[in-house]
Structures are given as C-alpha cells and as structure tokens.
UniProtKB/Swiss-Prot annotation:
This is Iron-sulfur cluster insertion protein ErpA. Binds 1 iron-sulfur cluster per subunit. The keyword Glycosyltransferase does not apply. The lineage of its organism: Bacteria, Pseudomonadati, Pseudomonadota, Gammaproteobacteria, Legionellales. Homodimer. GO terms for biological process: iron-sulfur cluster assembly. InterPro entries: FeS_biogenesis (IPR000361), FeS_cluster_insertion (IPR016092), FeS_cluster_insertion_CS (IPR017870), FeS_cluster_insertion_RrpA (IPR023063), HesB-like_dom_sf (IPR035903).
Amino acid sequence: MASVDVSQNTSDINFSVSAADKVAELIKEEDNSDLNLRVSITGGGCSGFQYGFSFDEQINDDDTVIIQQCSDGKSSVKLLIDSMSYQYLHDAEIDYIKGIQGEQFVIRNPNAKTTCGCGSSFSIGDEDDL
C-alpha cells in the first residue's frame, strides 16, 4: 500500500479540503469512523470510462491512500484509489462543489480527452499519454 499525505503536497492528485470536509460530514452521519472515500474508474458510461465514489472500510494492498486534513485543522480523512484507477487520475483534482445545480463531488481530470454531459463518464486518448 502506498501512502501519500496531500497536506505535504507529495501527491499528484489534489484532494481538496472542501471534499475532505464533505467526506468527514458523511462519515459522521454514518457513525462509522473506519470509513474512507474510495474513488474508482470502471469501464462503462457513454464515453468509455466512468467514475465511482463509495465508502469502504477495507484498505487493499494496491491502494494509494491520500490523507487530507479537514478545514477544522483537527480531523483528516482518507481517499483510497486502486492501482488501475490511479493511473487514469494522474494530476486530477477531486473536489466537492455547491452551486445552482446542487452539490456534488467532481473530478477535474486532465487525462480525460472527452467527457459526456453528465460529467461522470469520460474517454482518454492513447494510453501512451498516461
């Protein structure tokens, strides 16, 4: 398992403080401090790949663990990304936004060559670009 602490800017994936705050809020609602946010990429969607968000207590051997401190300065949360998904998320930003269309987790992924209107499906160019 690779462990990366984004508070020390050692990760090539940006897990925002606003995303960490929302994850902490959701974990508190579930009343299970062992939960971590897992981001994954699977085949499917209208553009070829799709993002998945889930909570997971299990940290697998091939997971990259990104730790982000919350805005309160006291608590932190963990983001888990499996090795297959990690290669497609290089230099991406995982954020939580509030806007006119509601609230949602978003991934700004520079590796995505095209995205669909829903924002949860994307395609990549040549795998050599990764």
